[in-house]
């Protein structure tokens, strides 16, 4: 049954409390490695309707996001968008909300972050993956879309 599956994979329930989601997250430390695993497991369990998640969506106020890009899912710890170009308007939906809302996103972004092994990384992203990252970084900042 569903419950046994959830216990084994550490798939967490999706948080929908707007007051909790409106709180800013704080930077993660190596003590939060289990949160990264749980978040990746939860994303993988929801891949049919979810392309990214932030830790506060599973009730943890830490700056950790996970992103699905094609067949891969990767984590970004303490992500900071350092550069963004090419603003555009888009309607976005979110697992934590019903319906979609308009927002401004950027075609190309650069991000400083730590990978799941807490090694420093710098990535350039464009298009769909960039949009997902921006949405999840907003979550870390207490912005729900």
Model-derived features: positions:
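Positively charged
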Residues: 5-145
């Amino acid at each position: 049954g569903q419950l046994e599956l959830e216990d084994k994979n550490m798939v967490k329930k999706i948080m929908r409390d707007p007051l909790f989601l409106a709180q800013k997250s704080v930077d993660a430390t190596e003590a939060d490695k289990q949160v990264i695993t749980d978040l990746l497991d939860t994303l993988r369990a929801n891949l049919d309707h979810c392309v990214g998640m932030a830790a506060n969506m599973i009730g943890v106020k830490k700056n950790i996001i996970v992103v699905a890009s094609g067949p891969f899912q990767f984590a970004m710890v303490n992500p900071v968008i350092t550069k963004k170009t090419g603003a555009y308007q888009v309607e976005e939906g979110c697992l934590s909300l019903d319906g979609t809302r308009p927002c401004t996103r950027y075609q190309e972004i650069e991000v400083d972050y730590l990978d799941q092994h807490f090694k420093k990384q710098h990535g350039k992203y464009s298009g769909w993956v960039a949009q997902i990252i921006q949405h999840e970084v907003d979550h870390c900042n207490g912005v729900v879309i």
